[in-house]
Amino acid sequence: MQIITIFGATGNQGSSVARSLLRNRSFEVRCITRNAESKKAQLLKAQGAVIVEADGYDTSQIQQAFSGSWGAFVNTNGDDPSLASENRTDRDLGLSIIRGAAAAGVKHLVYSSGPWAAKLSGGACSVPSNDAKAEVQHVAQGLGFETVTPIMPGWFFETFLEPQMAAIFGGFPVTPDEEGWLTCRAPLWGGREHVPFLSVDNDFGDIVHGVFLNPVRWNLRPIQAISDFLSFADFVNTYVSLTGKKARFVALSSPMEMETMGHPLLESIRGFFIFSQLRDGEYFGTGPTEKETATALKQAAHRAQANDRKGEQAALTSARDFLQARFGNSK
């Protein structure tokens, strides 16, 4: 049985990967966490994962945690405020982890990355959280792994359900504005307005799972991890068609109209729009936004989990699917 070890296993991405892999009996799933007694870690343990504790900045601990692993999925949170408070960076953390994994003899690395905005824009803009990940990805490709696959997540559908995130964009679909509308206020994405959306809960883990089923096929191939693409306006209109509620999209004339208050996460979000507009909406830096690759990978994972997923659909989660599941009965 091949061991796949996940760093960041209790986060949105890592837990999705763990859940998907645990449904394939060909893999043993090991999850690295800072606190093995946390509720999220204990839930993964109850589902069959092996839980190990390690400090991501301690390469020797990380090497031990990855020992014996055939594959690794690594995600770090570049917008984690604790990094700044500890005078550390996401780049430092990522480098420590991948070096520990390489030293442990991991063969196949799937790394949650992002487009290198500073490089792809010729220095015209920077998205520090993505740029740091892209730098770590570049280093990983020279560390002796047999394969390295960068996977680039799209915009999580699930963030619309978080009140704090909804408030950043005007309140949609959580809190009405002073005029009684559920308003989504954001800059345009650019180009054909193909905003790459992802259901991290439903699809991301399966997409990563699909890579591990044939890692040589996906070596050095940046993966667009998306579930659907459409404009913010169409997303809001889909919500209206399902719920009948008053909702609207209001386009900002420029990303610079977004208030960030110096917060790293908000600065990154504004940077996404600046970068995407510079690239005419081709956010991933690998060509037009597409979901054929993600579809093929999810279908491969579904086949590998056949005993556990009889009767389930292998399709990606469309915007309508996502909104129907959360709001479809509110009309």
Swiss-Prot record:
<dbReference type="GO" id="GO:0016491">
    <property type="term" value="F:oxidoreductase activity"/>
</dbReference>
<dbReference type="InterPro" id="IPR008030">
    <property type="entry name" value="NmrA-like"/>
</dbReference>
<feature type="binding site">
    <location>
        <begin position="34"/>
        <end position="38"/>
    </location>
    <ligand>
        <name>NADP(+)</name>
    </ligand>
</feature>
<dbReference type="InterPro" id="IPR051164">
    <property type="entry name" value="NmrA-like_oxidored"/>
</dbReference>
<feature type="binding site">
    <location>
        <begin position="55"/>
        <end position="56"/>
    </location>
    <ligand>
        <name>NADP(+)</name>
    </ligand>
</feature>
<comment type="function">
    <text>NmrA-like family domain-containing oxidoreductase; part of the him gene cluster that mediates the biosynthesis of himeic acid A, a ubiquitin-activating enzyme (E1) inhibitor. First, himA, together with the trans-enoyl reductase himH, catalyzes the formation of apolyketide chain, which is then condensed with leucine by the NRPS activity of himA. Dieckmann cyclization and release from himA gives a tetramic acid intermediate as the product of himA PKS-NRPS. HimG then catalyzes alpha-oxidation of the tetramic acid ring, with a subsequent rearrangement to yield apyrone intermediate.</text>
</comment>
<comment type="similarity">
    <text>Belongs to the NmrA-type oxidoreductase family.</text>
</comment>
<dbReference type="Pfam" id="PF05368">
    <property type="entry name" value="NmrA"/>
</dbReference>
<feature type="binding site">
    <location>
        <begin position="76"/>
        <end position="78"/>
    </location>
    <ligand>
        <name>NADP(+)</name>
    </ligand>
</feature>
<feature type="binding site">
    <location>
        <position position="133"/>
    </location>
    <ligand>
        <name>NADP(+)</name>
    </ligand>
</feature>
<keyword id="KW-0521">NADP</keyword>
<comment type="pathway">
    <text>Secondary metabolite biosynthesis.</text>
</comment>
<feature type="binding site">
    <location>
        <begin position="155"/>
        <end position="167"/>
    </location>
    <ligand>
        <name>NADP(+)</name>
    </ligand>
</feature>
<keyword id="KW-0560">Oxidoreductase</keyword>
<protein>
    <recommendedName>
        <fullName>NmrA-like family domain-containing oxidoreductase himF</fullName>
        <ecNumber>1.-.-.-</ecNumber>
    </recommendedName>
</protein>
<dbReference type="InterPro" id="IPR036291">
    <property type="entry name" value="NAD(P)-bd_dom_sf"/>
</dbReference>
<feature type="binding site">
    <location>
        <begin position="8"/>
        <end position="13"/>
    </location>
    <ligand>
        <name>NADP(+)</name>
    </ligand>
</feature>
<dbReference type="GO" id="GO:0005634">
    <property type="term" value="C:nucleus"/>
</dbReference>
